[in-house]
Amino acid sequence: MEELRGYLELDRSWQRDFLYTLILQEYIYSLAHDHGFNRTIFLENAGYEKKYSFLIVKRLITRMYQQNHLILSANDSNQNEFWGQKKNLYYQVISEGFAFIVEIPFSLQLLFSLEGKEIVKSRNLRSIHSIFPFLEDKFSHLNYVLDILIPHPVHLEILVQTIRYWTKDASSLHLLRFFLYEXRNWNSRISIKQYISFFSNRNQRLFLFLYNSHVCEYESIFIFLRNQPSHLRSTFSGAFLERIHFYEKMEHLVKVFTKNFQVILWFFKDTFMHYVRYQGKSFVASKGTSLLMIKWKYYLVNFWQCYFSVWSQPRRIYINQLSNHSLDFMGFLSSVRLNPSVVRIQMFEKSFIIDNAINTFDTLVPNIPMIGSFAKEKFCNIFGHPISKPVWADLSDSDIIDRFGRICRSLFHYYSGSSRKKSLYRIKYILRISCARTLARKHKSTVRTFLKRLGSEFLEEFFMEEEKVLSLILPRDSYTSQRFYRGRIWYLDIFCIHDLANHE
């Protein structure tokens, strides 16, 4: 970011919200392809100034609009030359640069807002597993939860209008419309779900930016409305970026609430409500009654329909009781369980036995979905019986063992916070036997013969790193070691869902 900031100091157009001029700058395309902002890219890739010169970029934009005219006038998409290999390059080159440009105002405003503030920079705060200690602390005291699937915008203009709140550059908005509509013009018969899948694969960076902007717009208004009736006004952090007329909109909303909706929204008052989201799935948990959750459910449906023009079916929001329902979240099955305990109290010559029950937040490994993921990747069949993986049979023995071992260790690392570790040993069993069968298939031998020949060295590849460290410090049968193996550990170096744990 400091690298980008240095370049933009020479070009003041971005400070007047003119993003369109940046797309004609050569360094933008170099930085767009160098996600780490490494200075050496200009030395290692000497051809960038030739490939992305001012004239070439300007010519590409002109040709894109000319080809777009052909799209609108052509009836047969098979005769459309824009989707040929040569014409497709125009869209790909410009869209990658544009995806980088639209992120600049938000990144720089965040950087400027943090200047002079002593904020601890910790990568652990980015870990997706940092949310589970929060859930353990808060959700164990709540009653109901709304399981919400955030709907996608049906009309593409909704995405453009969302970006319009953040920038004043009309030219950039026109170019954004072109990127969004060029695929829809190519084939208007595809559904919005098919188009989103197509667009996300074609330009993932731009798609993620637009989707996050859509979710940010929804959350900024939803959380503001939620804080009004509950009287729990949050302090705005510097990380929340300013939008056009945002504070004016807030003041207007406060006046509207005071005059018209204060009595109505009083029914939504709940001081024990918590909101959690990851990607397109979110939860709203509350200590209130089921009637309150039903009101929030239909309020959200109407909110999406009225503000975002999104038709959200009520079945996308489920009302569940935490005590008898499990939440499918980030590859875990989470639930609130009543954990009974017996306490003996001695008072002088008399003793009393008190039964005490404490709510605990359990996180379990979903066995059936995990077996489904393993079967999809050809580690086992649909019944969970390990099979060989023929596509790896051409690798060396050490590479095969290393691949299976890395998958096993990474899964144990990801599910280290599980309440019940025994279910993980089925995963280890599937991977170990699948590895042995793959090696036996390669050498045209039996699994039993191969396991005898490899011995303990083969098993060592399937131990977790922390198990290896503990085995050097503590005896395997010691009480401290056993408590460690059974305990829940959340590692704060995990930034995305494991591929095999993503069951969606």
Curated annotation (Swiss-Prot):
GO BP terms in the entry: mRNA processing; RNA splicing; tRNA processing
Cross-referenced InterPro entries: Domain_X, Maturase_MatK, Maturase_MatK_N
Localization in the cell: Plastid, Chloroplast
Pfam family, one: MatK_N
Keyword tRNA processing: yes
GO cellular component: chloroplast
Signal peptide: none
Gene Ontology molecular functions: RNA binding
Family in the record: Belongs to the intron maturase 2 family. MatK subfamily.
Protein name from the UniProt record: Maturase K
Source organism (scientific name): Nepenthes mirabilis
